Amino acid sequence: MAILAFQKPDKVLMLEADSRFGKFEFRPLEPGFGITVGNALRRILLSSLEGFAITTIRIDGVEHEFSSVPGVKEDVTNIILNLKQVRFKQVVEEFESEKVSITVENSSEFKAGDIGKYLTGFEVLNPELVICHLDSKATMQIDITINKGRGYVPADENREYCTDVNVIPIDSIYTPIRNVKYAVENFRVEQKTDYEKLVLEISTDGSIHPKEALKEAAKILIYHFMLFSDEKITLESNDTDGNEEFDEEVLHMRQLLKTKLVDMDLSVRALNCLKAADVETLGDLVQFNKTDLLKFRNFGKKSLTELDDLLESLNLSFGTDISKYKLDKE
């Protein structure tokens, strides 16, 4: 059954943008869609984007987080609290984790920037953050492990990275998003004033541009919703190949190829010719070559041109092998 057309934006307007803040506008939206889209994007942005954070530390002479370090003003608990705030940006793609050993001496302060001096694959984004204060003669040896993750992970779940009894797991704040706000306002389309405008503000730690963060959040939502829209996808299989995996492009193509031709804007003549040949969906149509179609009863070049224009507008073409999309799989 054809879906009635929705009033929706044809593009996203970026009102403001730099490396840490972006303001975006979506308009027009159907009544009620502002809060639906805004809330979904906000939750995904805050909870589901990937980032990098410290997962474990080891300090010479320290056995647990309730200890203190000789010559250091802060106890280990406060040192950990400060280390949790250090933000990292990946600068070498091959590096998804890194472990460094740092010696702090002849300094009254240990800052986040001191960690950056030892790193190869990452950049510290807040180098002025003070981790702890030291006496003039104090020395501290600390090992730090950085890993890739998503959202927030408590210390207990980071115990898998502990390779020694004196290694201390810490809470990891992976999310690169600092804050997300959205507002829904009325918007006028011609004579109707009950449409909506969604304004979304995204603040990041600088490891990802707000525009890219928005795109990643949208991809996550699209991927999950596409699973609901394809009733033929099964998550479990008795085949020896095990579970099937579908990327976003395959999911999109499956949905597109299952579209019925009667729902497309085709002439009655073309539809009747195709129906007589049992060609009912886009998937049926794209399997034919142009010469095959011209053999259909009452099918002429005008109808062929009409179908050719339709497929071109959908980035499809005649003579396509659709076997990899498994349209007949139950």
Swiss-Prot record:
Residues 248-330 are annotated as: Alpha C-terminal domain (alpha-CTD). GO terms for biological process: DNA-templated transcription. InterPro entries: DNA-dir_RNA_pol_insert, DNA-dir_RNA_pol_RpoA/D/Rpb3, DNA-dir_RpoA, RBP11-like, RNAP_asu_C, RNApol_insert_sf. Transmembrane segments: none annotated. Pfam families: RNA_pol_A_bac, RNA_pol_A_CTD, RNA_pol_L. Residues 1-232 are annotated as: Alpha N-terminal domain (alpha-NTD). It catalyses: RNA(n) + a ribonucleoside 5'-triphosphate = RNA(n+1) + diphosphate. One of its GO terms (molecular function) is protein dimerization activity. Keywords: DNA-directed RNA polymerase, Nucleotidyltransferase, Transcription, Transferase. GO terms for cellular component: cytoplasm; DNA-directed RNA polymerase complex. Its EC number is 2.7.7.6. It is an enzyme of class 2 (transferase). Belongs to the RNA polymerase alpha chain family. The N-terminal domain is essential for RNAP assembly and basal transcription, whereas the C-terminal domain is involved in interaction with transcriptional regulators and with upstream promoter elements. DNA-dependent RNA polymerase catalyzes the transcription of DNA into RNA using the four ribonucleoside triphosphates as substrates. This is DNA-directed RNA polymerase subunit alpha. The gene is rpoA.
